Amino acid sequence: KKDGYGWWVQRMTHCMELYDVVRIDHFRGFDEYYAIPYGDKTAERGKWEKGPGMDLFHTLDKKIKDLRVIAEDLGFLTESVLEMLKESGYPGMKVLQFAFDGSEDSSYLPYKYDHNCVVYTGTHDNETTKGWLENLQGHDLKFVREYINCYEQPVNDCVWALIRTALSSVADLAVIPIQDYLCLGNEARMNAPSTFGDNWKWRLTANQISETTLYHMREVTRIYGRLAKASEEKETDEIANTEEEERQDNDQNLS
C-alpha cells in the first residue's frame, strides 16, 4: 500500500499483456487471510489478518486499462467477502460439477445464475467431466442425468450435454476444459489438490484434436451465441460470398 501496490500493478499489467482475462485465486484472501508466523511448523499460532480489500482493486482498475478479472469465490465466504465481490464488479465462478452434490437446490445450478459470472464444466482442480460422471453414483448421478435429459445415453453424450448446459446458460463467460471437449477420463486430469504425484503433467498433443471435434466445438459455440465478434463477421462474410457466387452461377445458367 505504501508504494501504491506497485508489485500488484506490475504483475497484473504483465498478465493482461499475456492473457485475455486473469483469474484471481482465493479471492477471499484479499478480505481476510490467515497469517502464520514464519518458521512455525504448525498453524496453531496463526491468526486472521485484514487484507487490502477494495483499496487494491480500485488501484488496479484505475492503473490498468481494460482489466478483466475472474474472482475465484468458491468455498466458504463471509458476508464481507460477498460485499467486496459485489463492489468490485468482478464475475465469480460457477462450477457445474458442484451443482450435483446431493442437493437439488444448489446455487451452482444454471437456472440460478445471473449474467455476471463465469461458468465452468470443471476446473483444473476437478476431475474431468467424463471421469466425474463415471465416479458419480446414486441420487447425484440420477439427478444430473435428469437435469441434462441424458438418461440412457453413453457417458460421452452426457459430457457434451453438460458442455451445452454450460454454454447455454446466462453466464457472460463459459470456460470448457479441452479435456471435456475431447471426452477424456481422469487419466487427463490436470491436478488433484493436496496430493503429490502426476499433477500438472498432462499435455495436449497435436493429433488429439480432429477436424470433427473442432467442427463440433465451433458449432456449439456458435449456436449459443458465444463466437468472438471477428469470427461472426468472418462467417457472415463467407455466407454472403457464397450466396453471391450462387447468384452469379444462376445468372450464368439462365443466360
Give, region by region, the residue ranges found by the protein language model.
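Alpha-amylase-like alpha-glycosidases and glucanotransferases acting on alpha-linked glucans and related
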Residues: K1-V175, Q179-N186, A192-N207
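Generic secretory/membrane-interface signal
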Residues: D66-L67, V119, E238-E245
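Structured C-terminal cap/extension of enzyme domains
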Residues: C183-E238, E243, N250-S255
